[in-house]
């Protein structure tokens, strides 16, 4: 039941944010009484903490599962495409919602963000090949991270409004433009 509560809470927090999600919403989503939630969790903040932890664990697992050994420009394109469009949209939306998380959770969220950024940095650096890329390593990483953050915001809205296929086509064009910016001619 604890896993089901968290799974449903992730959906609710991703759609309504922390303040918009109530314990009543969570209890109704798993068909239990609100009082029964307290058997599993002390309060909404604990449920949110666990949801955020699961979100970041999902991202790290996704990164580690979805890389391949093709650390080429084509491999980078495939990696970026997967990291934008194959991630469960609930986690993207929850990630976007973190900016409005309770202030008491800032240090925990910052820790999780640092962990995911380290994992992502370590994965992206494998695609860096100075014989093909005109930027230095840090500029290359920063440009890719900026691109991913922008697309996460877009993807969260695209999925909400049902234009994901249009977004995929735009992504393809924009990632090629991005790659052309830093490839050596």
From Swiss-Prot:
The answer to whether keyword Transcription applies is yes
**What is the top-level taxon of the source organism?**
Bacteria
Question: Is the keyword Transcription regulation in the record?
Answer: yes
Recorded protein name is Biofilm operon icaADBC HTH-type negative transcriptional regulator IcaR
Q: Which is one GO molecular function term here?
A: DNA binding
- The species is Staphylococcus epidermidis
Query: At which residues is the DNA-binding region annotated?
Result: 22-41
Q: Per the database record, which ranges form the HTH tetR-type domain?
A: 1-59
Gene3D superfamilies for this protein: Tetracycline Repressor, domain 2 (1.10.357.10)
Q: What does this protein do?
A: Represses transcription of the icaADBC operon necessary for biofilm production.
Quaternary state and partners of this protein?
Homodimer.
InterPro entries from the xrefs?
Answer: Homeodomain-like_sf, HTH-type_Tx_Regulator, HTH_TetR, IcaR_C
């Amino acid at each position: 039941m604890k896993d089901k509560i968290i799974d449903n809470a992730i959906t609710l927090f991703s759609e309504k944010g922390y303040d918009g999600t109530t314990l009543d919403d969570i209890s109704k989503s798993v068909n239990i009484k609100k009082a029964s939630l307290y058997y599993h969790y002390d309060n909404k903040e604990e449920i949110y903490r666990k949801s955020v932890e699961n979100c970041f664990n999902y991202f790290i697992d996704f990164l580690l599962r979805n890389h391949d050994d093709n650390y080429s420009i084509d491999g980078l394109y495939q990696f970026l495409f997967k990291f934008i469009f194959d991630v469960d949209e609930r986690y993207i939306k929850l990630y976007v919602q973190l900016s409005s998380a309770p202030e008491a959770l800032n240090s925990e969220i910052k820790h999780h963000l640092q962990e995911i950024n380290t994992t992502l940095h370590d994965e992206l650096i494998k695609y860096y090949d100075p014989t093909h890329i005109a930027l230095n390593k840090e500029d290359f990483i920063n440009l890719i991270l900026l691109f991913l953050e922008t697309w996460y915001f877009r993807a969260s809205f695209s999925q909400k409004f049902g234009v994901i296929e249009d977004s995929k086509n735009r992504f393809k064009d924009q990632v090629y433009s991005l790659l052309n910016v830093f490839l050596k001619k």
